[in-house]
Amino acid sequence: MTNAKLAPVSIVVILLAAVVVGGCGSQSNAAQKASMAAAGRRVSSAPLVKEPGQPGPVWKPVASIGAQPAAWIALRSGVTLLRFDQRLVHLALHAGSGEPGGQGWSYGDRIGTSEIHQILAAFNGGFKLSYGSGGFQADGHVAVALTVGLGSIVTYRNGTTDIGAWQEGVPARGVAVASVLQNLHLLVDHGVAAPTVENCILRCWGATLGGGSEVARSALGITGDAQLVWAAGEHLSPAQLAQALVDAGVVRAVELDINPEWIAGYLYVHHPGGPAGVPVVPGQLGIAGRLLAPYSRDFFTILAN
């Protein structure tokens, strides 16, 4: 999905400073200062924004397409939330070099040259495909067959994304599909957390390092007005993650990867030398290269339309 003329992408520095100072794993102090300095030359701070009449997170705008806010961040009870306006941005599913591997994908194992002037954000994908919890399809190629009823992140060829249970809500009839990533059953459906989030943690929501219930977790959801919301934190139970999404207005959501090594989200500051990724989850270990270098696992990017 491309436009003939791309408006400049700007990252708001006030929230990035707050997040980085909160401590984001592998980011060095020098890298923090460089990223913030680059951001500071381009943008100004933004006020707190609370959705009128809606209880829940306090959102701050962190990215704009031209003069229009396109992405917001909120930090709430140990959960980082990123919200994206699909009228201005679109989601792209990337194939990792090992998961699913292979050649011929439109979006491969790093943020590509066609994306570097469009990139707003990127974040981790789902469980390892060998775990048997879902499927992967893109560009008409099936890496792992899709399963009826599983939670599915479906991006259509018109650039929009929806989330739902496969063949039980998605895909939309008559709309061409570009990609699908499946992972487990829906974490949130009809604006309510799945009934298993309290009493079926390991079997239903994935094995954890050490067998604990509160580990690094992530998820992607969609609101009633079709905005995408990514949520992640370093010490979350399935119930805590689901509740944060519900509080953010999410009506359907898929849990993505879990455990510290695999959870990472970035916003990208644009400067003459190219985009620089700034981590958004306090304490995240991070991904070498911040998805601008080859990565073995599948992941998502958020791109300006």
Residue ranges and their predicted role:
Residues 73, 80-83, 151-155, 218-222, ...:
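Short beta-strand scaffold segments in enzyme catalytic cores
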Residues 25-145:
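Zymogen propeptides
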Residues 20-23:
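C-terminal motif of bacterial Sec signal peptides marking the signal peptidase cleavage site
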Residues 95-100, 105-247:
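Aspartyl protease catalytic domain
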Residues 84-87, 155-160, 190, 222-226, ...:
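Short acidic-glycine loop/turn motifs at beta-strand connectors
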Residues 232-275:
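Active-site signature of cysteine proteases
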